[in-house]
Amino acid sequence: MVSPAWCSIALALLLALHEGKGQAAATMEQPASAPKGRGPHLRFRRCSCNSWLDKECVYFCHLDIIWVNTAGQTAPYGLGNPPQRRRRSLPKRCECSSAGDSACATFCHRRPWPEAEVTSSSQGPAAVLETSKTWTAAGDLLQKLRDISAAKLQFVRLRPELTREAIPAHSRRRKR
């Protein structure tokens, strides 16, 4: 004769397996109910870049890209499908999806890489590094950062004695 403890364990196991089977059947039915004629996944873009090599534009325009830092470069994933039409040959760096997006319009219709201008002043590089607390234009922060970088380069060129001298590499040959 079978003990009541074994019957309880067998009954609990049977109920657990039965519930698990029902969940597996429910998950198997979900993909079947999805429409099969569904087209490619479309991603929301703020604008469309003229060149995939312009990483700043791609980062600005494609809002749902996951950026992965690799050893030598930053690789964008999730760019979607290849373009279905010919490339445009426009002087602008991108084309906005919405005409009312003023931030997009200022980003897309300016030159791709504005050069930072080095201002030679009698006050020195420290005066160039001072910035105001508010910026008037959307790209003003980027311009200020480029000005700071240019001022640092100018400072290093004016004072070469402050830069470190190159340390000679260790010789691989054994000395006798």
Swiss-Prot record:
It comes from Rattus norvegicus (Rat). Residues 23-44, 68-176 form a propeptide. Keywords: Cleavage on pair of basic residues, Disulfide bond, Secreted, Signal, Vasoactive, Vasoconstrictor. Residues 1-22 form the signal peptide. Pfam families: Endothelin. One of its GO terms (molecular function) is endothelin B receptor binding. This is Endothelin-2. It comes from the Eukaryota. Belongs to the endothelin/sarafotoxin family. The keyword Oxidoreductase does not apply. InterPro entries: Endothelin (IPR020475), Endothelin_toxin_CS (IPR019764), Endothln-like_toxin (IPR001928). Vasoconstrictor. Disulfide bonds join C47-C61, C49-C57. One of its GO terms (cellular component) is extracellular space. It is found in: Secreted. Residues 94-109 are annotated as: Endothelin-like. PROSITE patterns: ENDOTHELIN (PS00270). One of its GO terms (biological process) is macrophage activation. The record marks W67, V68 as: Cleavage.
